[in-house]
Curated annotation (Swiss-Prot):
Domain of life: Eukaryota
Keyword match Aminoacyl-tRNA synthetase: no
Species the sequence originates in: Arabidopsis thaliana (Mouse-ear cress)
Biased composition (Basic and acidic residues): 226-235, 356-367
Phenotypic consequence of gene deletion: Reduced growth of leaves, petioles, stems and siliques. Delayed flowering.
GO molecular function list: DNA-binding transcription factor activity; sequence-specific DNA binding; transcription cis-regulatory region binding
GO cellular component: nucleolus; nucleus
Residue interval(s) of motif Bipartite nuclear localization signal: 228-241
Protein name per Swiss-Prot or TrEMBL: Trihelix transcription factor ASIL1
Compositional bias of kind Acidic residues: 246-262
Location of the Myb-like domain: 94-153
Region ranges (Disordered): 1-32, 61-94, 189-295, 346-383
Function, as annotated: Transcription repressor that binds specific DNA sequence such as the GT-box-like motif 5'-CGTGATT-3' in the AT2S3 promoter. Negative regulator of seed maturation genes during seed germination and seedling development. May target GT-box-containing embryonic genes by competing with the binding of transcriptional activators to this promoter region. Contributes to the maintenance and control of seed filling and may repress the maturation program during early embryogenesis.
Length: 383
């Protein structure tokens, strides 16, 4: 063996052109790969040849068995139960039994009232149920279960499209289960599309579509009439008369136009008349015979209206009296104001007259003084 190792470690430079080109060195393999080397003992006559002709190397890959979150080896093969970051695993990782368990667990939560769309907590519960069933080779995560359900839904839509195109019933094993879970929302759409696309005798398809339109429009008209009658019946009119005077016949039903009646009555399914009609006005019995609860409510409302009417009447009377008092007070105030103005005018006139008299007295005094002075001067001159 030592001679063999020496022969392998020293290649012949002269024979490098004659020997075939050595293959490139293999890449670094992971720890789970095993390399087996086989060395043949060289023959005496072929000692001058390259040792690469006698050395063979074989790489054996051992399967990497990991848990549910394995990331895969270096050769690009992902682990059996990936973490879900790469799309949640491939479809071939789900067996038929595992898919059945998944659909049942998902359907139980999907059909619960108020759920509709599952949250992350519900998907985790579904994943736990699938893992406990031990139908999967590797554990599944909530993201893988959600992606698998999306794939199953797409498959169901494809099968529905095939049925609508006339390929016959579906042979898919999970079709009936999904039809019971989510088939109610798509049955009407698929049937309408199939009736539009498939001719089915031409005139027959057109007559059915027109009949469906007439029936839909008729149902809308009936619904509007019911809403109108309901709103009219809630309008209660109370009067302050006796029971015999307050009784009145209900208004006749509005007659539909010929076009609406013809459209609202399809030939196959005629619209049934209403079973009862609520009166627009409530008949109030003041005798108090202890009837139904509606009569008690009506009597209570009637008493309330009478009390309210009395209060309003008293309020109007009080307001009229207050208005009279206000007008009387305003009249008195106006008279007092006029009296005050008259008094003020009299005082002003008196002051003016007093000033005039004082002015006249002053003028007279001045005249008298002048006369006295002139008389004295005349006496002195004559003397």
């Amino acid at each position: 063996m030592e001679d063999d190792d020496e022969i392998q470690s020293i290649p012949s430079p002269g024979d490098s052109s004659l020997s075939p080109q050595a293959p490139p060195s293999p890449p670094i393999l992971p720890t789970n790969d095993v390399t087996v080397a086989v060395v043949k003992k060289p023959q005496p006559g072929l000692s001058s040849q390259s040792p690469s002709m006698n050395a063979l190397a074989l790489v054996v890959h051992t399967p990497s068995v990991t848990g549910g979150g394995g990331s895969g080896n270096r050769n690009g093969r992902g682990g059996g139960g990936g973490s879900g970051g790469g799309g949640g695993g491939r479809d071939d990782c789900w067996s038929e039994e595992a898919t059945k368990v998944l659909i049942e667990a998902w359907g139980d939560r999907f059909s619960e009232p108020g759920k509709g769309t599952l949250k992350q907590q519900h998907w985790k519960e579904v994943a736990e149920i699938v893992n406990k069933s031990r139908q999967c080779k590797y554990p599944k995560t909530d993201i893988q279960c959600k992606n698998r359900i999306d794939t199953v839904k797409k498959k169901y839509k494809q099968e529905k499209a095939k049925i609508a195109s006339g390929d016959g019933p579906s042979k898919w094993v999970f079709f009936k289960k999904l039809e019971s879970l989510i088939g109610g929302t798509t049955t009407f759409i698929a049937s309408s599309k199939a009736s539009e696309k498939a001719p089915m005798g031409g005139a027959l398809g057109n007559s059915r579509s027109s009949m469906f339109k007439r029936q839909t429009k008729g149902n809308q008209i009936v619904q509007q009439q019911q809403e109108k009658r309901g709103s009219d019946s809630m309008r209660w009119h109370f009067r302050k008369r006796s029971a015999s005077e307050t009784e009145s016949e209900s208004d006749p039903e509005p007659e539909a136009s010929p076009e609406e009646s013809a459209e609202s009555l399809p030939p196959l399914q005629p619209i049934q008349p209403l079973s009862f009609h609520m009166p627009k006005r409530l008949k109030v019995d003041k005798s108090g015979g202890g009837g139904s609860g509606v009569g008690d409510v009506a009597r209570a409302i009637l008493g309330f209206t009478e009390a309210y009417e009395k209060a309003e009447t008293a309020k109007l009377k009080l307001m009229a009296e207050l208005e009279k008092e206000r007008m009387k007070f305003a009249k008195e105030m106006e008279l007092q104001r006029m009296q005050f103005l008259k008094t003020q005018l009299e005082i002003t006139q008196n002051n003016q007259e007093e000033e005039e008299r004082s002015r006249q007295r002053g003028e007279r005094r001045i005249v008298d003084d002048d006369d006295d002075r002139n008389g004295k001067n005349n006496g002195n001159v004559s003397s």
